[in-house]
Amino acid sequence: NNQESNRMNNDARISPRALREIYLKGFEIAVKESQPWTVMSSYNKINGVYTSQSRELQTSVLRDEWGFKGMVMTDWFGGKDAVAQMVAGNDMLQPGLDKQYEAIMEALKSGKLDMSVIDTNVRRVLEMIVKTPRFKGYQYSNNPDLKAHALVTRQSAAEGMVLLKNEGALPVSAEGTKVALYGCTSYDFIAGGTGSGNVNRAYTVSMIQGLENAGFVVDKTLKDTYEKYIADDQAKKREALKGNPMAMFMPLARPEEIVPSASSLQANVAAADIAVITLGRMSGEFLDRTASDFELSANELKLVEGVCSAFHAAGKK
């Protein structure tokens, strides 16, 4: 499924060749090369059948062809027919509803569903459980090594960056270099996406902290301006979300960028050695990408053009 809109009812009509060569290929590689313990079925239908109710997908392709030995679970509240899900080989229904239990019990009593199907599904769930460290007596510390995690994150961030073009801007000497830091994302980093992509982080190293840790000096006037602007914007958005049950899954929308005045730009140019601009986008569960996710807004264009023109005119980066 390539979309979040109407994801619970979307019916993807796909030819067998496109399904095999494009959509299933990544899953096939993952299953065959890594032998995962679990697989999750998606919300949508494929060619008229919910994926969680498709025996062709859950059993014929996944298990018989690819050799998957683990457990299949639904996405939360996925699918419509609990009995069909059992027959398909979707072993666990999440989060589990009374009506699903009742439908399965009724189907067993009427003979519509054979107990051997339930036995197979339960066996696969139990086989997964007995392999877990917890079942084998592992006692978690609830004290993760956050420093080690931070080192991995730092390495991933560096390796994941793409430098499109360098016109003499890099490298920059850090020690004592004064930086005019622009863009709301410079002061409010994005730790994760929306919905299940949200991250319960212990802390986030901001652009300011990163620069200062490296020896740069960040312009305090700009810092104070942005931090107040962002705090006020977030307070308004939190107030607007009060009473919305989805608020806990949705990080606050990014604030509109500040367009600096000509006078403030000149003051920043005089006080700083270089300018850094950070623009950010939020993405994740529940929402599809729109044109504005890829294109710069009017304020972003004005910000980039204004800052670059002012600093370049002064012979600065």
Stretches with model-predicted labels:
Residues 1-317:
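Glycoside hydrolase catalytic-domain context in secreted enzymes
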